[in-house]
Curated annotation (Swiss-Prot):
InterPro entries: A/G_cyclase, Acylphosphatase-like_dom_sf, Adenylyl/Guanylyl_Cyclase_3/4, BLUF_domain, Nucleotide_cyclase. This is Photoactivated adenylate cyclase subunit alpha-like protein ST-. Keywords: Cell projection, Cilium, Flagellum, Repeat. GO terms for molecular function: blue light photoreceptor activity; FAD binding. It holds the Pfam family BLUF. Residues 204-332, 615-744 form the Guanylate cyclase domain. SUPFAM superfamilies: Acylphosphatase/BLUF domain-like (SSF54975), Nucleotide cyclase (SSF55073). Residues 801-846, 887-923, 963-993 are annotated as: Disordered.
Length: 1019
């Protein structure tokens, strides 16, 4: 479609596309203009006065394999040979060389371009040809610009131009290996991945799991070798998947997702079986102590329809979406239960030939999570792969003195200049808050981090007065007329002159390139102000380095960079514009850590594998599996794209780092000090889901049912890059990576939208910890914590309330069986709330647990020294008090208690021996009768209420105590706060006068006998 522009009945221009027409109208400052649209048939591609048809323009970037030879003479010889060939076939080309990169634009017919580019790609003098643009053109833009000596030094001495060409090209080629394979293929075809619409495909999909990789991560002796394991797994997966005509979609923690076309089902199974054999060979050749001898894989294969699409905006992923992805994941999980290394669905079996079908063995119908109908699966005749045996081998594994090839080092042990930029620690408090629309198109500000990483020690020693140069690029928010540019130059010149800042500003086809020279403090301050300017967007700092003297002599040199230089070499503006746009587009697919490391002038291959503690976040859409079954592929894409957009924006706005986009699931991490930011991001995600449902409540739209759960956990992860130049992954892996998914799954069971664990709650600010958290009875085999607090968040369809909930985590001496047993409420107890508080009670309890330890007799090696008592008190979630072993004289009949044996759970205590009658119940105490092994046992719990605190008494029948025995005086409190902990608290009660009931100033542990109470210790 063409648009013909008329003014006063005279045609002044013909423009292709409505958008270009609007830009022309704005830039020309013409108000009385009329635009007419004309639809044109295939002759649209007819170009120029020569009558040529099917003209196309192709722009590519490549890296020289011989940069040391690329001098002026070398380029002149190359240009002479190319010019003769171009004239013979009627192709127009220009070449720009900026060491070590070639930029070339070719104009010609489809047939000529395909022939020429095939020969160019095979030329050994360069490598990694990346297409920046490839599309039809209406005419030859560069006229007779044949292959001239186009060395950058012969075109301009402008340092901004040289910097932008080198830095963007360098970052562009480095990011290539981090791109999803589909996005990289799009670029090779000259297409922008984030501009492509969803494309339905029939695929054979597989999930490849590293067996018991979480056990490897949890093994303290194998932490150093995790990077080696991941590197070997990534390399083997890429080699076998791509070697059988497949593509790797993504890598998750210890998981590879790959797919094949519908006609490559047999090749897919051959590749997966070969992967298992390669890992077996790898295990057999490992020296003693190598963790690679414990690497096994498990695969599940499914066939179905999926949508190849771009999901997300600020951080995006070019991936597959659809119900078949969820089913393939469930089938792989089912293989754990069936103890088989390879499991495939009935749909995959139908795609196989007769010969391979005969080798299959049916494994009957099985129910998988999230699906109403059972799934019929098949397997090959292969040895069993038992996860329990692999786990046992890993737990018993001793690495000895083996040293990893890529050792993982603690993050804190590295010098600040050597630490990878894994956290976005840009200070935001002093910067004006931006609206969501303003922040949407802006990339994460990396200025202060670049200053820490890229500057040498000599520059850091110079402080704020060190002279530096900063170059950034940005895109104009709207077309700039000559009056707009004149206004920018006038204001910037006056501002820079007053601040004694020099620099240059280049404007090319909607792209700004600016270089600033000044002391470090002044440049940083000005750059932060420039970022807030609404006249441009996508602000990216591409270069920052110390200099000895100023490059520019004026406050703002603008005209020489736009007119004189571009008049000398017109094609340069297209190179700059297309390269910058492609760089900004690709940055959304590459991890932020890699991008920050690149823009600081570093080689990402030198990123050091580190172990660091982080706050991990995981969120996904509730009931997504049945939702994907009932919705069309386009509706699934709409739901995921909308949800991922909101999640990535909320996470990045709070300083978090997005790790992976896994279908409807988003994982991210925050710094150890960013627990509050993580909670705020959770609240924003939940609020968005609720607002989205409200917005589409009365409209028949699939987004009206979007509800989500969010989980937070804290733990150590390994951050390392794995793979090769073909495909590189920046991996964030750790035991917490799997655990946070289980925490997020608790949102369905608990009926809450946000669930956090105890370590996260310990790192929250006092305001959030004391007023924003409520207890969670469901948990992960751990001690319950109870926090009062108001409701937080917005209600959603699958959740009764949206609270921050704290699940249980493993404590010393606790067992999974016991933890699961006590998760269920007993008869007559409420499902939620404190199991021993009266209904409606608002009293804040102390949560405590009691443990008994056998102690040796003083001065001897005998174990008849008595019982040690440990009381763990969690006071309102703010601190933890712990009293370790307390010596008690032994006497009478002693019960056998193993080391660390848990004899009390939360606020309950076990009875020791059978045959004793339950004592009279003290006030507010509840008794529970249990039958174990045919014997009656009583367990007693007492909770005494006060205004704001609760004094807990753990009661245990102990017949072995001597009659009339009284223990020593109480220990002093371990209260971490200032002042004497034994002082009377205004809200704590005095000792009670009721007979048989101890009410202490501090929480106390008591042992109960039928004759009365004996205090052991208080604190």
């Amino acid at each position: 479609m063409y648009n013909r522009v008329y003014k006063e009945r005279q045609e002044i221009r013909t423009i292709q596309g409505l958008e270009a027409s609007g830009q022309f109208q704005t830039a020309s400052n013409i108000t009385d203009i009329q635009i007419y649209s004309i639809n044109v048939t295939p002759t649209m591609s007819k170009g120029g006065e020569t009558g040529e048809t099917q003209l196309r323009r192709l722009m590519y970037l490549s890296a020289s394999t011989e940069p040391e030879k690329c001098n002026a003479e070398y380029l002149a010889d190359m240009a002479h040979v190319a010019t003769l060939r171009n004239k013979a076939i009627g192709v127009i080309r220009f070449l720009l060389y900026s060491s070590p990169f070639f930029f070339q634009v070719i104009e010609g017919t489809d047939e000529d371009l395909d022939f020429l580019f095939a020969k160019i790609s095979a030329d050994p003098r360069h490598e990694r040809c990346i297409v920046l643009a490839n599309g039809p053109c209406t005419g030859r833009m560069y006229g007779e610009w044949h292959m001239k000596d186009s060395h950058i030094d012969n075109i301009t001495n402008n340092p901004a131009i040289k910097t932008i060409l080198f830095q963007i090209a360098r970052s562009f080629t480095s990011m290539w290996s981090y791109l999803p394979k589909n996005a990289a293929n799009m670029l090779l075809l000259g297409k922008n991945p984030n501009k492509q619409g969803p494309e339905p495909r029939s695929v054979v999909l597989t999930f490849i799991y590293l067996v018991e990789f979480s056990s490897i991560l949890a093994h303290p002796g194998l932490t150093e070798q995790c990077a080696d394991i991941l590197a070997a797994f990534v390399e083997a997966s890429v080699r076998n998947c791509e070697g059988t005509w497949g593509l790797v979609a993504k890598f998750i923690t210890g998981t590879c997702v790959a797919y094949w076309p519908i006609n490559r089902a047999e090749d897919a199974l051959v590749g997966l079986q070969q992967l298992s054999e390669d890992l077996a060979v790898l295990r057999s050749y490992q020296p003693p102590g190598s963790a690679l001898s414990r690497i096994y894989s498990r695969r599940g294969v499914h066939y179905g329809r999926a949508l190849l699409c771009n999901a997300g905006f600020r951080k995006a992923d070019f991936t597959l979406l659809g119900d078949c992805i969820n089913t393939a994941s469930r089938i792989t999980s089912l293989s754990v239960k069936l103890k088989v290394p390879l499991l495939l669905s009935f749909e995959v079996r139908c795609l196989l030939g007769d010969e391979m079908r005969e080798e299959l063995e049916r494994s009957a119908l099985h129910k998988v999570k999230g699906r109403d109908k059972p799934v019929q699966v098949y397997q090959f005749n292969a040895p069993e792969l038992d996860s329990a045996l692999v786990r046992a081998k890993i737990e018993q594994f001793n690495p000895g003195r083996y040293r990893a090839l890529c050792p993982v080092k603690p993050y804190e042990s590295l010098h600040p200049a050597q630490r990878p930029p894994i956290f976005d620690d840009t200070p935001r408090e002093n910067q004006p808050k931006l609206s969501q629309v303003q922040r949407r198109d802006s990339l994460v500000d990396r200025l202060s981090l670049i200053a820490k990483l890229a500057f040498p020690s000599s520059m850091m020693a110079g402080g704020e007065g060190q002279l530096i140069t900063l170059t950034y690029i940005s895109q104009a928010a709207h077309p700039m007329s000559r009056f707009d540019l004149a206004s920018i130059q006038r204001i910037a010149f006056a501002r820079n002159e007053s601040s004694n800042i020099t620099g240059s500003l280049l404007y090319v086809s909607g792209l700004f390139v600016q270089t600033l020279d000044d002391p470090k403090g002044a440049v940083e301050s000005l750059y932060l102000k420039i970022r807030q300017d609404k006249r441009h967007k996508d602000v990216v700092a591409v270069f920052m380095a110390p200099i000895d003297e100023r490059v520019y002599g004026t406050p703002l040199d603008m005209t020489s960079a736009t007119e004189e230089m571009l008049a000398t070499f017109p094609p340069l503006q297209d190179v700059l514009s297309q390269l910058a746009k492609s760089f900004i587009s690709l940055e959304t697919y590459v991890p932020s850590t890699v991008v920050r490391y690149l823009t600081a002038g570093n080689n990402p291959r030198n990123l050091q594998p580190v172990s660091v503690e982080v706050v991990m976040l995981a969120t996904d859409i509730c009931s997504f599996t049945p939702l994907s079954e009932k919705c069309s592929l386009t509706e699934v894409w709409t739901i995921c794209n909308t949800f991922i957009d909101a999640c990535t924006s909320a996470i990045c706005n709070e300083g978090g780092e997005v790790i992976k986009l896994i279908g409807d699931c988003v994982t991210a991490y925050f710094a150890p000090t960013g627990a509050d930011n993580a909670v705020h991001a959770c609240q924003e995600i939940v609020s968005f889901s609720a607002q989205l449902r409200d917005a589409f409540h009365d409209v028949l739209d699939c987004r009206s049912v979007v509800a989500c759960g969010v989980g937070l956990d804290f733990g150590q992860v390994i951050m390392a890059q794995c793979g090769s130049l073909r495909l590189t992954e920046f991996v964030v892996a750790g035991e917490v990576s799997a655990r946070v998914m289980a925490v997020e799954a608790l949102t369905r069971e608990a009926g809450r939208a946000i669930v956090i664990t105890e370590p996260v709650s310990d790192r929250l600010s006092a305001k959030l910890r004391d007023t924003g958290i409520v207890p969670c009875q469901e948990g992960l085999h751990a001690v319950l914590l109870w926090y009062p607090g108001p409701r937080m968040g917005i209600g959603c369809a699958n959740h009764q309330e949206d609270h921050l909930r704290v699940p249980r985590r493993p404590g010393p001496g606790r067992h999974e069986e016991g933890g699961r047993r006590h998760q269920r409420p007993g008869p007559g107890r409420p499902r939620r709330g404190h199991p021993f508080l009266p209904q409606g009670s608002t009293t804040r309890p102390h949560q405590f647990s009691v443990q008994l330890h056998p102690l040796p007799k003083l001065g001897t090696g005998s174990s008849d020294g008595g019982i040690g008592v440990s009381l763990h008190v969690y006071s309102a979630g703010r601190y933890r008090q712990q009293l370790h072993r307390r010596q008690i004289a032994a006497g009478g009949q002693r019960r056998s208690v193993g080391p660390g044996q848990d004899v009390a759970r939360a606020t309950r205590a076990h009875a020791c021996d059978a045959g004793h009658q339950a004592p009279d119940q003290p006030a507010n105490a509840q008794y529970e009768r249990q039958f174990r092994g045919g014997q009656q046992r009583w367990r007693t719990c007492g909770i005494v209420h006060s205004n704001a605190f609760v004094t807990g008494v753990g009661l245990v029948q102990q017949p072995w105590l001597d009659e009339g025995h009284r223990p020593e005086a109480p220990h002093q409190s371990l209260h971490p706060g200032p002042g004497d902990p034994s002082e009377q608290h205004p809200h704590r009660p005095n000792r009670a006068t009721e007979p048989g009931l101890l009410v202490a100033r501090q929480p106390a542990v008591c042992l109960h006998r039928p004759e009365g109470f004996a205090q052991i210790c208080t604190f």
